[in-house]
């Protein structure tokens, strides 16, 4: 069943994909077993059928142990975590908007390397439009409301509007101060 699921997979690392979740566990097993690093994504690798079957069996066992089903999406298995927030997230190490993950808790993996600050600027008809995003939030202070307030936007691949217009910034500022 799991092999058929991966054979029919569209090869997209979407958080809603069960096949992507199965693939994540399978490639983690193979990379660990062969002591491979990220260069294997570039150089390629040979995996014999026996190792692949062994890796799929490992993935099945992992899903049954931690989730009690083989029908687990990538977003249930791979999460983006900061503070008390945890969201399922798209991506693998070798895709656009790539991320790397590591074992986390309860059979899950958490991202630890991914996109950083993202900004899109567009000039149209003499007008500037800016959208931005940080994978977590605009603060490293755990007590700040901005510590992890952009995570949901990030996992949904959305951005927020921003401006460089000083008057608009002052008009909408939560607080105006001068750093010491």
Residues of each region from the PLM?
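Acidic, low-complexity N-terminal propeptides/linkers enriched in Ser/Thr/Asp/Gly that mediate export
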Residues: 1-180
């Amino acid at each position: 069943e799991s092999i058929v699921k991966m054979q029919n997979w569209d090869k997209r690392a979407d958080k809603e994909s069960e096949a992507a979740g199965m693939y994540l566990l399978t490639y983690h097993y193979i990379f660990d077993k062969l002591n491979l690093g990220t260069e294997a994504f570039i150089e390629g690798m040979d995996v014999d059928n026996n190792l692949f079957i062994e890796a799929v069996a490992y993935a099945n066992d992992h899903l049954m142990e931690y989730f009690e089903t083989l029908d687990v999406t990538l977003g249930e298995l791979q999460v983006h975590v900061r503070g008390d927030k945890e969201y399922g997230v798209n991506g693998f190490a070798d895709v656009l908007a790539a991320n790397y993950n590591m074992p986390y808790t309860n059979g899950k993996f958490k991202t630890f390397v991914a996109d950083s600050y993202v900004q899109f600027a567009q000039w149209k008809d003499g007008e500037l439009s800016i959208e931005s995003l940080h994978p977590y939030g605009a603060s490293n202070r755990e007590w700040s409301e901005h510590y992890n307030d952009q995570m949901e936007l990030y996992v949904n691949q959305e951005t927020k509007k921003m401006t460089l217009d000083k008057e608009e910034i002052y008009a909408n500022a939560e607080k105006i101060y001068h750093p010491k």
